[in-house]
Amino acid sequence: MTAEPNKPCQIKRDYPQLINLYPATAHNDAHYLSKLSIYQQRVFEAHSQQKLLVLGQMGLGNGLELLSWWRTQTNPNQRLLLKVFEPHPINAYELKLLWDQSASLAKVPELELLAQRLLHTEPTAIIGCQRLIFDDGRTTIDLHFGDIQSQLSSLIHSPLHPVQHWLVLPHLQNGLHQQIHWQMAKLSDDSATVATIGLNESSGLSETTVNRFQACGFEVRDFTCAEIQTNPQPDAILLHERHVLRRQDAKAYAFNPMAAILSSDAPSSIAIIGGGLASAHLALSLAERGQSTQIFCKDAKLGQGASGNRQGAIYPLLTPENDELSRFFQQAFLFSRRRVQALTSAPAPNQTPISHNFCGVLQTAHDERSQLRLDKIIQSQNWPSEIAYRVDAQQANCLANINIDKSGFFYPLAGWVCPYEYAEAALQKAQQLTEVKLHLETEILEIEHQSEGWYLITAKHRFGPFAQVVLANGAALTQFDASNKLQISPFRGQVSHVPAQFQLSQLATVLCANGYLTPSHEGLHCLGASYVKEPKHLDFCPQEQQENLAKMHESYPDQGWLDDIDMSGNNARVGVRMVTRDHFPMMGCAPDVPKIIKDYAQHQLTKESRHYWQTTPAPVHEGLYILGGLGSRGLSSGPLAAECLAAQLCSEPIPLDKATLCKLNPNRMWLRKLLKGKSL
């Protein structure tokens, strides 16, 4: 169940405003959709041999083109990635209002069904990319909201899977300037084509726009043309300009190494070390791409580490600046939420149970400093109401269903999820899609790189070789020689389990202040958590149990329901989360720290050193990757980090911008200093 925002916050634009921003392409939808379907079928037929077809669309319009692409994708041996660029962000409520008021879906029941599935994913009006995955990965839709040139220029060219074809909707056809055309060209295959929609003379492309597209090497045709060219021969000079753009991009971000490009037709042997949320979701994202994996877990079952809690809050981390950290966590939270929905709503027998409740999260302050911080977050941005909105004390009491008597910030799409069930469900789905071999009670003590690949060594066995190995082993992330220099710290967390009774049992949303308190699940609330750096042991600690209770008293003083929190049973769970200083997860190539230090000695604080580090690929351990450092918000960040690493391992477009990828890179702590000309 999703907590609903109040109506005044939810409705920001009425139908006349929406239809102006997201115009229908044609008034006669049935006739237009018939021609559109024929055109889209030709596109799929022209690229039928590709296992992944990447298409681009300029403009969302009223959404019919997007839905029609989805409907037309019927090839069971091909996956579709549709990237839609729309300058005006829109949310699910407004999309539904647009479709209901226009009745554009009334006569197309097959599109109406897809529209309902799209709305179920709760697209939100945030800047950046939202990845929506349907049909076990056969159809993926990337919604890029915000300034189109900014969105295009922020993306990395995918050499193996570039955009093969573009559809430009009429209301944007003559408004895209030359810089946008070049950015489209940068992300496209050298033989990519552009289709426009000219239903009448007034809606066609201007001669200037046609010339601009052609000046970037694009073949431009109306969508009604009988033939889709798949191998036009662009001008060699224009192709050179595209390649220069890509090289400039690659050079500017050389310090942020990506996975080595592998053949898309040759499956790679991938080993994942770890048995928690990160491992399971990486296996799922790879399985959706048809890639088999082997998982090595030291425990008797999944989710015995930081992923083993009964309940965990899932909500975005927001900052006053809405910087890369804030934008990443919004994207990641929404992606994870959609994963939970997809796993729990799949048709039987593929449905996988996950205890969860999207009952909302209510964030409040607990002292003067935290109040100033929360006020700054609330007031500094015009946050979409589906992300979060301010509530007064009376509204907060109503949402919590118990008295807290404090104003706060309410996240209506958020809530709680059972982490270990979430991990188990992801693995179960992955095993339904492809071969995923799970090695339980198999502790990897050492990893070794030879010319033929990586070997994993236990006390009794040696596994391998593997072309790619991912370290997703949580608290043990730094146990190997190749990873022991990672700048990441372990923090102990004790979560208290308290009986649901009296007023406390009525709690209806997750409370987050100095610590958190969840609604009851199977007769218990979760209250936590302690935060102890580099713990000496993982035994139950009575002092931390009392500290958890004290945090609630500090957060909500003098409330009667505090007396209902019974700690006498000493019921708790202790885990370790790995935390980075900047709160970003670690995702990407494992840095070769000794080599970085060695190179630093040769390029230390000279005039050329900053340029060297900016333009030289940073040293990495070939074929070794890191997925960890999820901290206290792994439920929100883990699945998207895993999805992005899976895309990287398979040389596919990544649903994050270049700046955010740099923030996630495991080498960032060293490179941040080196790029500024500072000493290590």
Curated annotation (Swiss-Prot):
Q: Which GO terms describe its cellular component?
A: cytoplasm
What keywords is this UniProt entry annotated with? Answer: Cytoplasm, FAD, Flavoprotein, Methyltransferase, Multifunctional enzyme, Oxidoreductase, S-adenosyl-L-methionine, Transferase, tRNA processing
Residue ranges for the region (FAD-dependent cmnm(5)s(2)U34 oxidoreductase) are 273-680
Renumbered to this chain, region (tRNA (mnm(5)s(2)U34)-methyltransferase) spans: 1-267
Please give the superkingdom of this protein's source: Bacteria
Give the range the annotation lists for the signal sequence.
none
Which SUPFAM superfamilies does UniProt cross-reference here? FAD/NAD(P)-binding domain
**Reaction catalysed?**
5-aminomethyl-2-thiouridine(34) in tRNA + S-adenosyl-L-methionine = 5-methylaminomethyl-2-thiouridine(34) in tRNA + S-adenosyl-L-homocysteine + H(+)
Q: Does the keyword Cytoplasm apply?
A: yes
Q: Name one GO biological process term.
A: tRNA wobble uridine modification
Q: What does this protein do?
A: Catalyzes the last two steps in the biosynthesis of 5-methylaminomethyl-2-thiouridine (mnm(5)s(2)U) at the wobble position (U34) in tRNA. Catalyzes the FAD-dependent demodification of cmnm(5)s(2)U34 to nm(5)s(2)U34, followed by the transfer of a methyl group from S-adenosyl-L-methionine to nm(5)s(2)U34, to form mnm(5)s(2)U34.
Q: Which family does it belong to?
A: In the N-terminal section; belongs to the methyltransferase superfamily. tRNA (mnm(5)s(2)U34)-methyltransferase family.
Q: What is this protein called?
A: tRNA 5-methylaminomethyl-2-thiouridine biosynthesis bifunctional protein MnmC
Please report the organism this UniProt entry assigns to the protein.
Answer: Shewanella sp. (strain W3-18-1)
